[in-house]
């Protein structure tokens, strides 16, 4: 796991923003909505302090609920790569959205090394990682999910805010822009009430001059719970 500033963050699954999407259908989200939603996932993931960030710690219910809002529930990843076994309770009726393997790059002269300033430069830098992606899979209760629920996505350019205690230990609290992301993401319609096992796996071999061989492997033991209306 890496949480130093390298102008990247990999999150294999892993918002305080209202989402315009109601629910994920059985066929998945419309492809046109994914480039914006991937940016919103990063805004959620990077806004959470490192001490309680579910992308860094082994989250239980105390961390997987942090920052969640709206009808789509974000699942965290492992920043820098690695494996994790996690437990999380999800409100009934919520759709799920998460990366399988991805790479974010952003402009920040405050915490070098500088890997690009323009959107094109930032995208070009991450190409070796993206080209090396392989062995991508998502299973729910030991069954492969539909192909329409797992897609390669190139994000729209976005910005995000880092708190003082953030996942990039060398970066000061600030708003960073532009940022770009690319990788494989999955969306799941609301699950039935009760227990479910979700397994997410992805790999990238970008060579020794970039980031080497990265394996992302995360298992979620999910419990879908009824929502209490008061």
Label the predicted regions.
Residues 161-185:
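Aromatic sugar-binding surface patches on proteins
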Residues 1-11:
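Bacterial N-terminal signal peptides that target proteins for export
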Residues 24-73, 214-217, 222-230:
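N-terminal segment immediately downstream of the Sec signal-peptide cleavage site
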Residues 203-211:
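Short acidic/polar inter-strand loop motif in beta-rich domains
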Residues 91, 189-193, 213:
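Surface-exposed coil/turn segments at beta-strand junctions on protein surfaces, enriched
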Residues 72-163:
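Extracellular-facing segments of soluble proteins and assemblies that are Gly/Ser/Thr-biased and enriched
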Residues 94, 192-199:
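A glycine-anchored, Pro-Gly-centered beta-turn/N-cap motif
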Residues 10-22:
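Bacterial N-terminal signal peptides
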């Amino acid at each position: 796991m890496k949480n130093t500033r390298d102008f990247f963050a990999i999150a294999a699954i892993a918002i305080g923003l209202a989402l315009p999407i109601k629910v994920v259908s059985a066929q998945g989200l419309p492809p046109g909505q994914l480039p914006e939603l991937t940016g919103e996932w990063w805004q959620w993931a990077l806004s959470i302090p490192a001490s309680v960030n579910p992308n860094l710690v082994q989250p239980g219910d105390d961390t997987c609920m942090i920052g969640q809002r709206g009808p789509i529930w974000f699942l965290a990843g492992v920043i820098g790569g690695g494996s994790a076994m996690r437990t999380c309770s999800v409100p009934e009726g919520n759709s799920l959205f998460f990366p399988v393997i991805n790479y974010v790059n952003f402009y920040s002269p405050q915490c070098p090394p500088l890997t690009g300033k323009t959107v094109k430069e930032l995208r070009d830098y991450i190409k070796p990682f993206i080209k090396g992606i392989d062995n991508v899979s998502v299973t729910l209760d030991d069954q492969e999910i539909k192909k329409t629920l797992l897609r390669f996505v190139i994000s729209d350019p976005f910005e995000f805010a880092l708190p003082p205690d953030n996942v990039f230990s060398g970066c000061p609290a600030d708003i960073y822009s532009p940022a770009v992301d690319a990788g494989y993401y999955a969306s799941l319609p609301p699950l039935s009430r009760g227990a479910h096992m979700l397994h997410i796996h992805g790999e990238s071999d970008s060579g020794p001059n970039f980031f080497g061989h990265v394996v992302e492997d995360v298992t979620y033991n999910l419990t879908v719970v009824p929502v209490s209306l008061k």
